[in-house]
């Protein structure tokens, strides 16, 4: 019978499918999530790197264990005290083999040490030995490689706690070793033991669970025994009263709970099929699929809807049924439902509930969208599950596209051939094609902002990470046009200001492309206006992310030339008078703009700007002539008397 173990651990629950992988979530500063990073926190489940054929998992204080179907063990996370068992004290962000182990049938991770149960009924252990956690009589402070627990055989179940361990023997008794200052060895003493000692008075034991400093045993009749630390009432010792007689009256006074107990005592709960022990709380799974909890509730880990406090009375976890397995972490709790989903409650600042938030929860909440889960494990501040492999996205190319969608995006990663859906944020991809286990091609849907590209498999959805980002780039926007008007003949250099102008592929004045353009920056383009028809047009800029929308700030006006004054406006008939012409729509420079005095053309025409030109008058007969400005094929309209010149 599998059971949940511990504080900083959990029990190794058995799983089935040979292709099963592991998901992890929560705190990761020591690499205990096994995803190849030490990204501090993951608030939703993500895949542990490179694991398949997993049958059981266990989570320790800052390390994790996985049992494979071939009877070997993988470990990852903190290794300062050798708890990974690979002969070093170097931590690992990905699973590594525990050398020399084979025929393993169960694993259990304590706070800073590890256990493995072999098929021959013996137990191997490694990691810290400060309090005799290795149980081998070994006098050193740690072992970086597995050592045999001394004098132990016929073991059928193991559970590693904060700094002690429990084992269930095939004859229905239980044994313990390690720290004992709180009575957690259950042998009637409060002393540590470097070798296994019998837990006093227990028979017909079917499962054991080691918590932070307390132990639980499930008996064959469905009852539970507890021992060890009781500072948060985690032993579930029933309340007792003493009788006080004063002046003929009888009073009942509640007796204080003991701080600990070195021998097992009964917990008032029946019909139990599994037990789990956290740092300072305890759990029992009933045959009805309900869960009972008692002990410390400072982080809402009892799941009964209350916040804070503690209780020695087992109470039902709110709204939970159909549970098939339970797991107690340090101050959080997990439950596996019959449909393969996971619920969690309690402490959550580090994301160990897996629901995408950092808020504690006094009632069960879903751990993301995990599905098909077959086993769960709760560590000090992280969680694990076994089930169909999750995908991991490691790259997105291109990493940006238009808000209108439609871009073809190559997604790289792991287990992508198992994909049943691809999402850009909350929106499904327009379509996707599985190219290989490491590549998917997807069509980006419409969207805005920066989103995570996620892959859904039978096990759930890939965890968001820094490499799965896709940015929806807005189309360019024009905020300013300088100058706002120019001659219809074209050829004017226009400065276009705005946003998102980098990478421009086209600039148009109305429907006509600019003669040329230069992208100065993401906020500026210089464009040469094409010839146009007198009147306003909208300038537009096109980039790979779309075309700028029409606004009042992109208006450019093509002007016919006008004459508003001639200075002087009279001169001798032989010509040669230098005249300054004021108006608009002139082409700066020499040669583009001409002026007609009647039918005769002025000479030496130079336009200093679009509003001022100088010229020399041709010869003319005495009288008044209309002057016309011509820019290319465009001719100014009559505007007497401002455009009239008098020959004297």
Predicted regions and their residues:
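Short strand-edge motifs at loop-to-beta-strand transitions and within beta-strands
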Residues: 438-442, 523-527, 611-615
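Surface-exposed, short loops/turns at beta-strand junctions within beta-sandwich domains
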Residues: 444-450, 530-535, 618-623
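Short beta-strand segments within Ig-like beta-sandwich modules, predominantly Fibronectin type-III
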Residues: 89, 190, 358, 431-435, ...
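Beta-strand/beta-sandwich contexts
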Residues: 388-418, 460-503, 546-592, 634-648
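Short, surface-exposed alpha-helix to beta-strand junction/turn motifs within ectodomains of secreted
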Residues: 416-429, 500-514, 586-602
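Conserved structural position at the C-terminal beta-strand
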Residues: 455-457, 541-543, 629-631
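Eukaryote-biased RCC1-like beta-propeller repeat architecture
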Residues: 1-5, 10-391
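Residue-level detection of beta-strand-connecting loop/turn positions
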Residues: 70, 171, 288, 339, ...
């Amino acid at each position: 019978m599998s059971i949940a173990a511990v504080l900083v651990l959990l029990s190794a629950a058995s799983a089935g499918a040979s292709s099963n992988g592991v998901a992890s979530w929560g705190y990761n500063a020591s690499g205990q999530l096994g995803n190849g990073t030490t990204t501090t926190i993951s608030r939703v489940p993500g895949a542990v790197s490179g694991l398949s054929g997993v049958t059981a998992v266990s989570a320790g204080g800052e390390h994790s264990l996985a049992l494979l179907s071939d009877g070997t063990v993988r470990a990852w996370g903190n290794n300062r005290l050798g708890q990974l068992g690979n002969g070093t004290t170097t931590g690992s962000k990905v699973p590594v083999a525990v050398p020399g182990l084979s025929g393993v049938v169960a694993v259990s991770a304590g706070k800073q040490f590890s256990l493995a149960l072999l098929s021959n009924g013996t137990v191997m252990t490694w990691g810290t030995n400060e309090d005799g956690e290795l149980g081998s009589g070994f006098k050193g402070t740690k072992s970086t490689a597995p050592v045999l627990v001394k004098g132990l055989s016929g073991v059928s179940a193991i559970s590693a706690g904060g700094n002690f361990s429990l084992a269930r023997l095939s004859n229905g008794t239980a044994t313990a070793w390690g720290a004992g200052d709180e009575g957690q060895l259950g042998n009637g003493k409060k002393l540590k033991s470097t070798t296994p000692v019998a837990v006093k008075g227990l028979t017909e034991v079917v499962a054991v669970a080691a918590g932070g400093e307390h132990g639980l045993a499930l008996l064959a009749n469905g009852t539970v025994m507890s021992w060890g630390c009781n500072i948060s009432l985690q032993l579930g010792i029933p309340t007792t009263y003493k009788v006080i007689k004063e002046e003929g009256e009888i009073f009942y006074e509640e007796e204080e709970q003991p701080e600990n107990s070195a021998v097992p005592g009964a917990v008032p709960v029946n019909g139990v099929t599994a037990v789990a022990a956290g740092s300072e709380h305890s759990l029992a799974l009933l045959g009805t699929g309900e869960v009972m909890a008692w002990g410390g509730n400072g982080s809402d880990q009892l799941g009964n809807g209350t916040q804070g406090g503690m209780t020695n009375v087992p109470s039902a976890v709110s709204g939970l049924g159909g549970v098939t397995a339970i797991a107690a972490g340090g101050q959080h709790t997990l439950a596996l439902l019959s449909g393969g989903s996971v619920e969690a409650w309690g402490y959550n600042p580090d994301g160990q509930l897996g629901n995408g938030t950092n808020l504690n929860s006094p009632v069960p909440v879903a751990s993301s969208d995990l599905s098909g889960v077959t086993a769960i494990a709760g560590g000090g501040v992280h969680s694990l599950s076994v089930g169909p492999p999750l995908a991991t996205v490691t790259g997105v190319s291109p990493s940006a596209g238009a808000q209108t969608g439609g871009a073809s995006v190559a997604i790289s990663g792991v287990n992508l051939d198992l994909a049943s859906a691809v999402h850009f944020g909350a929106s499904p991809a327009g379509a996707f094609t599985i190219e290989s286990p490491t590549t998917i091609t997807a069509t980006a849907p419409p969207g805005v902002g920066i989103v995570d590209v996620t892959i859904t498999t039978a096990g759930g959805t890939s965890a968001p990470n820094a490499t799965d980002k896709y940015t929806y780039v807005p189309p360019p926007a024009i905020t300013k046009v300088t100058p706002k008007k120019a001659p219809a003949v074209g050829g004017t250099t226009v400065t276009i200001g705005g946003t998102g102008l980098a990478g421009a592929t086209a600039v148009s004045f109305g429907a006509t492309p600019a003669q040329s353009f230069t992208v100065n920056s993401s906020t500026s383009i210089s464009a040469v206006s094409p010839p146009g028809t007198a009147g306003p047009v909208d300038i537009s800029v096109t980039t790979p992310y779309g075309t700028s929308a029409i606004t009042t700030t992109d208006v450019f006006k093509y002007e016919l030339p006008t004459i508003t004054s001639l200075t002087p406006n009279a001169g001798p008939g032989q010509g040669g008078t230098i005249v300054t012409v004021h108006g608009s729509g002139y082409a700066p420079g020499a040669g583009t703009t001409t002026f007609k005095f009647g039918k005769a053309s002025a000479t030496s025409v130079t336009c200093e700007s679009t509003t001022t030109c100088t010229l020399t008058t041709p010869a003319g007969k005495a009288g008044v002539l209309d002057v016309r400005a011509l820019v290319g094929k465009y001719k100014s309209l009559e505007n007497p008397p401002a455009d009239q010149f008098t020959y004297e």
